[in-house]
C-alpha cells in the first residue's frame, strides 16, 4: 500500500532549557556571533535545530531577558571595549558600530545611551581625558 513512498523521520536532539541556554551563551558570547549584523533569533534557532519560539522561551526562562536585549547588550559591551581601546582610537563611530554588530551608528548610539546613560561619543571623549 505504501510502496513508492519515501518516509523520512528526522531525529531531534532533546535538550533541556538549561543546556540550551548554556549552548546559546557559548555560541553568542564566546564565538562572537553577535558581531554579525545579520545574526537573528531565526539563525540561532536554525543552528540549534529548535524553533525560534523555543529560543525566545529559553531566553525568558533561563537567561532572564529577550533575545534582542541580550544580543544588543553584548554588542554594546563590545563597542565600549573598542571605544576604550587605544588600538581603535582612530576608528569612526560608524566603524565601531559595524565591528560590534550594529547595522549603523545611530542604532549603536540609541542602545549605548539606554545601557550606559551616555553616548558613544561622550564615552570616547571621557576615555581621552
What spans do the regions from the language model cover?
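Alpha-helical bundle regulatory/interaction domains
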Residues: 1-33, 41-42, 46-52, 66, ...
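Short hydrophobic/aromatic patch on the recognition helix
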Residues: 55, 107-108, 112
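DNA major-groove recognition helix of helix-turn-helix
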Residues: 59, 71, 111-112, 124
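Short, basic-rich loop-to-helix N-cap that marks the start of a DNA-contacting helix
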Residues: 65-71
Amino acid at each position: 500500500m505504501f510502496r513508492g513512498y519515501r518516509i523520512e523521520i528526522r531525529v531531534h536532539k532533546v535538550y533541556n532549557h538549561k543546556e540550551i541556554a548554556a549552548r546559546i551563551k557559548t555560541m553568542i558570547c564566546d564565538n562572537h556571533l553577535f558581531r554579525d549584523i545579520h545574526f537573528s533569533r531565526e539563525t540561532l534557532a536554525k543552528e540549534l535545530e529548535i524553533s525560534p519560539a523555543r529560543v525566545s522561551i529559553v531566553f525568558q526562562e533561563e537567561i532572564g531577558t529577550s533575545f534582542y536585549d541580550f544580543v544588543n547588550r553584548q554588542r554594546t559591551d563590545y563597542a565600549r571595549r573598542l571605544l576604550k581601546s587605544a588600538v581603535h582610537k582612530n576608528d569612526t563611530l560608524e566603524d565601531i558600530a559595524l565591528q560590534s554588530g550594529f547595522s549603523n551608528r545611530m542604532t549603536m548610539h540609541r542602545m549605548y545611551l539606554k545601557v550606559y546613560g551616555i553616548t558613544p561619543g561622550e564615552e570616547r571623549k571621557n576615555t581621552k581625558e
